[in-house]
């Protein structure tokens, strides 16, 4: 069929993701998303984005979601912000700490992110990955300009990490993941 402007209509269909039990207490309505920034086939920074009541169940920081930094070596959450930079330590309205959450499938998530960057031919990207209760990690989208709020969530700048891996020759995905975790 065609649209009113006589151009073909396009629709995307995807499976409905099921929320893992781990995230039920800290996600409002929607599915949490792990954003991994990859440069030069090396994952350099990551955050967990949690949907909130303020963001109406969307994992979008600009709309009021929570961004939680992730330790690259362990896949464990560290520091957190809400919205555009308000520092928080607990899930709003609860006593649940945001630090110390162990992200399941961490190595696989990093591997998927590096492989997506290799296939895309983008020098720098943000891979958005959700975890389905039954199927594990699923790539939602790749972002050529993924935004910089990941730095606020991690209380750390990207520039130093990017400079550290610029020009490093990465022949295998495994090596890129290993360097990203060091």
State what each model feature region is.
Residues 1-82:
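Phosphate-binding site of ATP-dependent enzymes
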Residues 1-2, 113-120:
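Hydrophobic, Leu/Ile/Phe/Ala-enriched alpha-helical segments that form helix-helix packing faces
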Residues 10-12, 107-110:
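Short, positively charged
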Residues 11, 122-125:
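PAS/PAS-like sensory domains
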Residues 35, 128-130:
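Short, surface-exposed charged micro-motifs
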Residues 52-57, 87-88, 147-150:
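A short local loop/turn or secondary-structure capping micro-motif enriched for an aromatic residue
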Residues 68-98, 109, 113:
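Intrinsically disordered, low-complexity Ser/Thr/Pro/Gly-rich regulatory segments
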Residues 90-108, 118-122, 131-182:
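C-terminal active-site "lid" helix and adjoining low-complexity regulatory extension at the edge
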